Design a protein with these regions (language model features):
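Structured, helix-rich domain cores that form ligand/interaction pockets
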Residues: 1-178
Length: 178
């Protein structure tokens, strides 16, 4: 764990920042912020799908690392994703994904986006993305067409779920049936 100390020039708050694998952990007298990808923390990539039980173990591991129980931490941003192995290149399927009410639809050569303020839906070629980021591609995805779907709640997680979502909710199956 690399640890640095800094002072926020706007608030004069003293921050301690540490990094564990891909996770950045910031702490001051009033709050703790943990940023990063749980699958990347666990597997070193985000191609593999993280199981709910593994999510709980990661929360425990990070809690032990910083000596603070993170299970009751309020989530400010959540990304949900899955990979779909397809017959054709992912871009082939974009034309079948029409418009979505109250979302702005935008596509480029390799991705399809649906934007609605703090909520974003993305479809893209995960293998192309992984290669561009020089990620190791797990064997089950090598030489495959992989369509990645992501739903990103960039803010207002509470508004979307109509309640505070805590870190330990990530292991609860009902959260994913919403």
């Amino acid at each position: 764990v690399n640890i640095t100390e800094s002072i926020d020039v706007h608030t004069q708050s003293n921050w301690i920042t540490g990094k564990a694998k891909n996770m950045v952990i910031r702490r001051n007298a009033n709050s703790i912020t943990v940023q990063g990808s749980l699958p990347k923390y666990q597997y070193g990539n985000n191609l593999q799908t993280l199981q709910r039980a593994d999510t709980g173990l990661i929360i425990e591991e990070l809690s032990d690392l910083i000596r603070t129980d993170l299970s009751k931490a309020r989530l400010q941003r959540v990304d949900f994703s899955t990979n779909i192995i397809t017959e054709h290149k992912p871009q082939y399927y974009y034309r079948f994904l029409g418009h979505l009410t109250r979302f702005y639809r935008h596509s480029d050569n390799s991705s399809l986006y649906y934007n609605q303020g703090c909520k974003k839906l993305l479809f893209y070629d995960k293998i192309k993305d992984a290669k561009a980021k020089q990620m190791l591609i797990p064997k089950q995805y090598q030489n495959k067409n992989v369509l990645r779907y992501e739903m990103r709640l960039l803010k207002q997680v509470k508004k979307f779920f109509k309640r505070d979502v805590l870190a330990n909710d990530l292991i609860n199956k009902q959260l994913y049936n919403y």
